Amino acid sequence: MEKITIYQFTDPVCVWCWGNEPVMRAIDYLYGNKVGVEYIMGGLIEEITTLYDLKGSKRQIIERANAIMAEHWLSASERHGMPVNTRHMALFSERYPSSFPQSIAYEAARRIDATAAKRLLRRIREATFVEARRTSQIDVLIELAAEVGINAARFIDEYTTGEAQNDFSQSRTKCRRNGITGFPSYLIKNASTKISLGGYQNISTFHTIIGRLSEGKIKPRRLGPSLANVTDFMRRYQTAYPVEIEVTFGLDRDRTDLMIDELIRGGRLTSEQVGNGRRLAIANAAKAFRATPRTGQNHHEAKQASAKGSATVASHQKVGQ
């Protein structure tokens, strides 16, 4: 059967890309390997001081830009349902005025392990939007990479050689060649046909296009919204947000909340408040910072590598200094 691939033109700190995470996760869960999802980094913010027409010192401009962006995050969150944490939000600073480091980190990870790179992209977004971390900092990026099973030393090497920077430049060129003017944007294609979409999309749009491109041969799994199925979903991804369950199983918000609350009462899920929403986790899940079979690297070792790597990256990093 011919495979369909969805390309998302994106940036790790794009709030509407964060808002489309439930759809991307639903596609992964419902279609499996019949539909691939790939990410092309476009570079949202090269220099925060030029994003808005603001006056004042560089520090004042950045502080105001952070405040404007926080307001935008809240507005977007109210529409797409993924939570954001804007308390003490200071994503950008004089030393870290760009979102390019996060994209370069993705490209560095992709050179090591393409699947782990997608997990890293998810963690960068999560750390940015619900944990309010400054994810352009190399020490933060190293820790996040280690969390998803990427060896910190290899990650630092890939980040600093310049090849990841070149890959990012090529990705930006792909965006321009495809006429991309905003994120997220999508290209859905099979061997002979491609369809472009601009902006935030709902799951029904992708169902329709996948059905059209496959002539009805590729269909999502039909899963009822049972407690067992939701538990299986959570076991697969370990953590999620309520709207991701809502989108995957075609529920309304009230029904979703009822099912989540029942799973929490039954001891199958845990919930923690994050920003203006809550993060769910499968009960008794292992901590995010843990040794992994692939790397054998634990949180302490990752922290040591992070400390050593920060000095190395400081002499190489062209963006965000």
Residue ranges and their predicted role:
Residues 16:
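Short, cysteine/histidine-rich loop/knuckle motifs that typically chelate Zn2+
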Residues 1-7:
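Extreme N-terminal starter segment of soluble prokaryotic enzymes
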Residues 8, 13, 21-29, 123-321:
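C-terminal cap of thioredoxin/glutaredoxin-like
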Residues 22-132, 242:
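Structural alpha/beta surface segment adjacent to cysteine/selenocysteine redox centers
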Residues 1, 100, 180-181:
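A generic fold-level signal
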Residues 4, 35-37, 184:
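Residue-level recognition of the N-termini of beta-strands and the immediately preceding loop/turn
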